[in-house]
Amino acid sequence: MAKKYCYLFSEGNANMRELLGGKGANLAEMTNIGLPVPQGFTITTEACTQYYEDGREINPEIMDEINRYIVKMEEITGKKFGDKQNPLLVSVRSGARASMPGMMDTIATQSGNPRWAWDCYRRFIQMYSDVVMEVGKKYFEELIDEMKTKKGVTQDVELDADDLKELASQFKAEYKAKIGEDFPTDPKEQLMGAIKAVFRSWDNPRANVYRRDNDIPYSWGTAVNVQSMAFGNMGDDCGTGVAFTRDPATGAKGLFGEFLTNAQGEDVVAGVRTPMHIQEMEQKFPEAFAQFTQVCQTLENHYRDMQDMEFTVEHGKLFMLQTRNGKRTAQAALKIACDLVDEGMRTEEEAVAMIDPRNLDTLLHPQFDAAAIKAATPAGKGLGASPGAACGKVVFTADDAVEWNERGEKVVLVRLETSPEDITGMKASQGILTVRGGMTSHAAVVARGMGTCCVSGCGDIVMDEANKQFTLAGKTYHEGDYISIDGSTGNIYDGIIATQDATISGDFGRIMGWADKFRVLKVRTNADTPADAKKARELGAEGIGLCRTEHMFFEEDRIAAFREMICSDTVEEREAALEKILPYQQGDFEKLYEALEGCPVTIRFLDPPLHEFVPTEEEDIEKLAKAQGKSVEQIKAIIASLHEFNPMMGHRGLRLAVTYPEIAKMQTKAVIRAAINVQKAHPDWTVAPEIMIPLSCDAKELKYVKDIVVATADAEIKAAGSDMKYEVGTMIEIPRAALTAGEIAKEAEFFCFGTNDLTQMTYGFSRDDAGKFLNAYYDAKIFENDPFAKLDRDGVGQLMQMAVKNGKATRPQLHCGICGEHGGDPSSVEFCHQIGLDYVSCSPFRVPIARLAAAQAAIAEMED
């Protein structure tokens, strides 16, 4: 049987979203429940896919079916397409199955009589030129403005039939000047041109970015709705409007929306005239308004969610043009979900499943004032690496950030890229802006952990660090100049934009409570400081899945001792230097155990290569030489010897413990002593340290380091007269470790997937450099998503699945988690649930996102 590419609204229903798109499925559903919908048909998403397969052409089979359905519309309406006496006038609109407001191009095609007809016709020429032929709207807007000036009026509605007729003529001339041919007059040519334009819009740059941000596959395609026209611009007894069944900003129950008399739908959306509040429609059109309020109630009860509707009143008669689940703020989403449960319309599981976890970000961070940000124009754009809004004076070094902050100045730290040395400056800043680096760069990861706004990878910035200035969009910014950055969108603004503090309502607690009832995955946090750990606990973390010990070495009072260790010539000298650091490490760990109140804490031993810790400033090198009793030249020679061509795959992780076992011994002593002390202070807690050895690729290598750790730990426990239990596990972040997980599990008591490095090594991409070519990959349709932001299930995911399966076959009680940045990405959390991980670990401010995503994964599995 031949594939069916067209469906009348009466032939479809709400369950056919994949085929008819969201708009088409909802038009069919409204038709089925007896609402007043201008009739028409939907061209399926499969026709869009076929259009691309056929080299961006509508093939004869699909064209014939479209023509047959036009005939069916003629039979339904009693009008004839292209007829001068009784024309069937249609609109052609996109219908992607996921709502894409403002991303898809929409066309209304019409023709007709006197003022109304010329108004329709000039609109049609303008929209057809803009959307189908891609002639910019601005040329036509300029002609309209000239006409209004000439006639001494301010609004389009004040132009009469002759003015509009003249405009139509000017528009046609503009079309010919731009396109080089006459405006088409054949309705069938216009119709096919409009349908092709909607198909084309599926592949426009805005739609591609939107899809990537919202996990919508390119392969879905868009449907096209061909619908008989309802006119709101035929006179004062006509109008058009957009309304929501609840307030999309607050979630409050009640009709919210706008209405315009004698206008078409795009006038409301485009804001060319100031509309009336929806309640004022009652005075103008009492009967249509009464019917509309009834329709709103019917739709909300039917879909059991807040609805966003478009409608037209033609000579007092109501027509529904669209309904969809309305976009809403995160705050409104929580209120609506809770209210729908209280009203008996939704179950707790359904309420949890309704919330987009990614939107919770905005509840936990400062945001820009909505009106101020709407009025502002970005000066540039990077990657929205850590959400929130920041405004402050530009500084270029971490030291300056600290100094300015101490004197009460709010600052934004601008760097080419950040390194662990910049931590203190990052903490002192309102926000961080980097020229280089991606979503998992050092700046991004650390900023997310601290809950600080960060925009990374703005390659348009021309940096001049020597003179403490940078240039963006033709303007040079000096130290002390104000900028504002949006860590959610990646936008960068000149000057000051007002911000608002984050607010969390009681609805947040209710939704999170329900989520915790349903989820199976535990949620931990990546935290290196007691403050981070405390914040994560407040947001619901059940332990620490990753504590990076190297960040602790950069504190002023301990970096000197660590540098002494690096520059030592003998084991004894190294041990003496490490002995100075031991009490600091122990103190840090005690504070973390205290903050976690007996919840599990996974401590990763030293991971970065040693060159990251050595001084770069002449003054610091001289200080180190003096402390070591060496010459400056000797210290410089040691620093030079630490240089590596590929440090990511160099002398780091457990390789450091193999060559310098004394480092692992010191860290083990610190972990165990801290745990014993905290356990003694809190006998009712269970303090059970988890020691994580990073970067293993071979079971023998892991055994070598584990033996050192176990011997040291057991000696400490025996000396303290304790019976403390501890575990030693490893990070799976090298493909070979995943492939040999069965062997590695003989030594490891737990696995934690470090998916940042596992992704780098599986792809062979550097996460800090991938931004240079990923956009080209998106444009070429090679990739649809950033593999560092959304877990690659086909490659990295398969390695993880294999490692879990083989590891648990060797050691059934092996527990497995993830601590890469993917631990806070909802689709990645879903995958972790599916492959049987025990926990995910993410930055503190992503903990609620992970809790909700884990619950949704469990609910989806129950439904299957």
Model-derived regions, located:
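Conserved alpha/beta-domain cores
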Residues: 504, 514-864
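Glycine-rich phosphate/ribose-binding loops and adjacent secondary-structure elements
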Residues: 316-319, 416-427, 431-433, 439-445, ...
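Short, flexible loop/turn elements at secondary-structure junctions
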Residues: 13, 96, 228-233, 398, ...
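Extended, non-globular alpha-helical segments
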Residues: 381-421, 472-510
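Short beta->alpha connector loops at strand-helix junctions that form conserved
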Residues: 41, 435-437, 456-459, 547, ...
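Nucleotide/phosphate-binding sheet-loop regions of phosphoryl- and nucleotidyl-transfer enzymes
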Residues: 1-375, 403, 409-412, 419-424, ...
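Flexible inter-domain linker/hinge segments
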Residues: 195, 364-395, 510-525, 532-535
